[in-house]
Amino acid sequence: MSSDKIFAEGESCKSAWHDATAGYDETDTHLEIMGKPVMERWETPYMHSLATVAASKGGRVLEIGFGMAIAATKLEEYNIEEHWIIECNDGVFKRLQEWATKQPHKIVPLKGLWEEVVPTLPDGHFDGILYDTYPLSEETWHTHQFNFIKSHAYRLLKPGGVLTYCNLTSWGELLKTKYNDIEKMFKETQTPQLVDAGFKSENISTTVMDLVPPEDCRYYSFKKMITPTITKV
């Protein structure tokens, strides 16, 4: 039913997202913005998997989307040198600034939509990238990660650098409506776009973990999660 979908046809939150209230619930297990389920604490093992990939080369890591600091906090446990984080929502960015003061590595908080910030970042600057932002429109629901990857991910990475990412809001819908095999979903809907962006298919790998979402999760109901590792050679 269309009423179950996260986005209505033609809906866009982009212009209002910056100022919208960041609704962290009392138990700090859910983050909701403009009525959208942005992140939930049950994702933790998966977020840690993404963070592990992004930190695997050490050095300077770029994280796009701060959310509940689940991946960010895990990244800080690794032997990295700098941790750059892009976040556009005011309330989430405030939490990022507070969190940054308590971390062991140099944090570079960058305020704004990634579309505004990323073009200002230099080529070959990062050893690892973790892209996990929320789709801000029905139009880009399934494709916003490719806009970043095709325009910027390859150029931002150093040779040997690694990219990982997710779009759970998209993948959850695809696994509900079109696919029952998560690896097939990734291979058919993601890999061709990564190759178009300049990455070689032999340098794209995935790992799958079992993780059962709570029954009330609106954006993901599949009982497996997939972590991509995409290396620039």
Swiss-Prot record:
Pathway of action: Amine and polyamine biosynthesis; creatine biosynthesis; creatine from L-arginine and glycine: step 2/2
Record-listed E.C. numbers: 2.1.1.2
Domain RMT2: residue ranges: 1-233
Molecular-function annotations in GO: guanidinoacetate N-methyltransferase activity
Record InterPro entries: GuanidinoAc_N-MeTrfase, RMT2/GAMT_Mtase, RMT2_dom, SAM-dependent_MTases_sf
Keywords on record: Methyltransferase, S-adenosyl-L-methionine, Transferase
Annotated GO biological process: creatine biosynthetic process; methylation
Family listed: Belongs to the class I-like SAM-binding methyltransferase superfamily. RMT2 methyltransferase family.
Lineage, uppermost ranks: Eukaryota, Metazoa, Chordata, Craniata, Vertebrata
Subunit architecture: Monomer.
GO CC annotations on file: cytoplasm; nucleus
Reactions the enzyme catalyzes: guanidinoacetate + S-adenosyl-L-methionine = creatine + S-adenosyl-L-homocysteine + H(+)
Protein name: Guanidinoacetate N-methyltransferase A
Residues involved in S-adenosyl-L-methionine binding: W17, M47, F66, G67, M68, A69, I70, A71, E87, C88, N89, W114, E115, D132
